[in-house]
Amino acid sequence: MSKVSGSNGGDSKNTLYCSFCGKSQHEVRKLIAGPTVFICDECVELCMDIIREENKTSMVKSRDGVPTPQEIIKVLDEYVIGQQQAKRILSVAVHNHYKRLAHAAKSSDVELAKSNIMLVGPTGCGKTYLAQTLARIIDVPFTMADATTLTEAGYVGEDVENIILKLLQAADYNVERAQRGIVYIDEVDKISRKSDNPSITRDVSGEGVQQALLKIMEGTVASVPPQGGRKHPQQEFLQVDTTNILFICGGAFAGLDKIISARGEKTSIGFGATVRSPEDRRVGEVLRELEPEDLVKFGLIPEFIGRLPVLATLEDLDEDALIQILSEPKNALIKQYQRLFEMEDVELTFHEDALREIAKRAIIRKTGARGLRSIMEKILLDTMFELPTLEGVREVVISDEVVKGTARPLYIYSDRSEEKTNVSA
């Protein structure tokens, strides 16, 4: 039951209090009234956090205690827009991987092999985000490595063992947990062989890294220095078995679509052949026809591709998909900026045509969803600079003219509801 102050002061006579935390209506931003109780915005937020955590742990699981593919894809849909085929491939691969681990202890005459995953798609289409979301769903340690920083052992740069060290750190040095984790190696297209022919000189950051990754991806006992690097020769090494670590590799593979198209042209020669200009097809559409031989042609060695049996290609994002990414996911960019403005007690509103204009600009930049934040920052920079010192603003409205740079955002004031500020840029 909410409390009412018994003070004789006129202002505090009918002060309402939150029934849960006891704070008064003056100490919180909002106080929501029920038939006999009151709850403040802070308690509502706390309740939502508790429910979110419980939902995460009470995920529907198969008999093996592993989330089902349908459950995995359902959660992925909440965070990642589009890419249905890639999400389906990933959810099945991850489900099978952890089901394999659940059965590993049981004696069986059939040994289940590990299926690492290769994600191929244009920049900004959600490869990294998919891998991060998967690790959150399964609740296992996750680490991300940049393939461009890796070199062969003995050369200046990061050893491949450093990847396992990062995973160990993500697992708080719990070796058992780390051995069930997920490793995402980004930019694998940058470690492609520099030439189609084997060279007499060593390619320490290209083919050399691919060779170094082979063993840890397939399964080996890696000796990991807890303090990293070679600067502490006296330290004791931790032994980490990589057999059950799921490796997901991703890359944009710029130019791979041309290799696929060239292979297709060879098989469609003659009077009855359908000839389509490469410009007529989107990159994602061409990538659907990807075969392992195309990756070999690109510069990955056959042994490396052999360790990545699951191939998932991602579509390049069109205008409608980018608009959805801006507004629909749980942590959509628009929702993030609206939350920032709420902290100033200001409502942030975007017109539909403004979202479309932002999406168009991201497509022109060719950076996919990654470019959306920088466009948003540019649009809202002046507003975020001015807002903390402005009095009485209750709403900021963004139109397509604001995105184009021909007008300033519309400020709506609470004390003078008719007064609006919209000065041409």
UniProtKB/Swiss-Prot annotation:
Gene Ontology cellular component terms for the protein in this record: HslUV protease complex
Residue stretches making up the ClpX-type ZB domain: 6-59
Keyword Chaperone tagged: yes
Gene Ontology molecular function: ATP binding; ATP hydrolysis activity; ATP-dependent protein folding chaperone; protein dimerization activity; unfolded protein binding; zinc ion binding
Keywords for the protein's UniProt record, in alphabetical order: ATP-binding, Chaperone, Metal-binding, Nucleotide-binding, Zinc
InterPro entries found in the cross-reference section: AAA+_ATPase, ATP-dep_Clp_protease_ClpX, ATPase_AAA_core, Clp_ATPase_C, Clp_protease_ATP-bd_su_ClpX, ClpX_bact, P-loop_NTPase, Znf_CppX_C4
Binding site for Zn(2+): 18, 21, 40, 43
Cross-referenced CDD domains: RecA-like_ClpX (cd19497)
Main function: ATP-dependent specificity component of the Clp protease. It directs the protease to specific substrates. Can perform chaperone functions in the absence of ClpP.
HAMAP family according to UniProt: ClpX
Family: Belongs to the ClpX chaperone family.
Full protein name: ATP-dependent Clp protease ATP-binding subunit ClpX
Phylogenetic placement of the source organism: Bacteria, Pseudomonadati, Pseudomonadota, Alphaproteobacteria, Hyphomicrobiales
